[in-house]
């Protein structure tokens, strides 16, 4: 088994490492101290990453959008490795800042992972926050108490969330809820 990074990803890995050193690390401590301030420096970086994702050079959460194969082709997972490698490098700079980047964080990852083609198009270029953490159960997805009950074409949400990542700045929020508490994670 070859555990070396593929040569075709070297440039991407190098670029992500440069972002970690030259963009994320220099502002990391500043936003640790001012944790409720919005890191405006990330807007330019997010635009750059958006452009790379559009060009097929996936670098983060939005990279998987539009990169799925047909049923005949099977799932195209090549973008997953490039995304993982770039995220590893950028976490060297600051993981929290990386997850705070517009359109690249946890909510967008959830959309990229499970949305159908219509939903992918609907939420393209949308900054999505993620609401998973609940009082008394933390972020344990199997323990989620918030429910989503189908009501015609809609779902009625009932529950409480805390610590919504990027919730005050995002355009949309992905809410983790269960459709059947007895089924645990498989009903989310």
Model-derived regions, located:
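A short core secondary-structure module
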Residues: 154, 160-188
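A short, Trp-centered hydrophobic/proline-enriched beta-strand micro-motif
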Residues: 125-134
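Hydrophobic, small-residue-rich alpha-helical packing segments that form membrane-like cores
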Residues: 134-140, 155
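Helix-loop "lid/cap" segments that line or gate small-molecule binding pockets
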Residues: 105-114
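Amphipathic, small/basic residue-rich leader segments at the start of a protein or domain
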Residues: 1-101, 122
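Short acidic, glycine/serine/threonine-rich loops at helix termini
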Residues: 140-144, 167-170
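A structural signal for short hydrophobic beta-strand segments in well-ordered beta-sheet cores
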Residues: 148-149
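Long, well-ordered alpha-helical segments
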Residues: 16-27, 115-121, 152-158, 188
């Amino acid at each position: 088994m070859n555990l070396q990074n593929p040569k075709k990803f070297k440039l991407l890995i190098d670029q992500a490492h440069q972002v970690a050193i030259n963009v994320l690390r220099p502002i990391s401590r500043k936003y640790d101290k001012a944790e409720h301030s919005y890191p405006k420096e990330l807007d330019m970086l997010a635009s750059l990453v958006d452009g790379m994702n559009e060009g097929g050079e996936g670098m983060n959460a939005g990279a998987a959008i539009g990169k799925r194969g047909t049923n005949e082709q099977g799932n195209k997972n090549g973008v997953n490795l490039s995304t993982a490698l770039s995220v590893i490098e950028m976490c060297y700079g600051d993981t929290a800042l990386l997850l705070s980047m517009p359109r690249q964080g946890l909510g967008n990852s959830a959309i990229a992972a499970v949305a159908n083609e219509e939903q992918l198009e609907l939420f393209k270029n949308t900054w999505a926050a993620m609401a998973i953490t609940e009082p008394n159960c933390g972020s344990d997805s199997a323990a989620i108490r918030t429910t989503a009950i189908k009501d015609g074409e809609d779902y009625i949400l009932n529950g409480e969330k805390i610590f919504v990542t990027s919730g005050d700045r995002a355009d949309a929020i992905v809410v983790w809820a269960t459709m059947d508490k007895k089924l645990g994670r498989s009903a989310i």
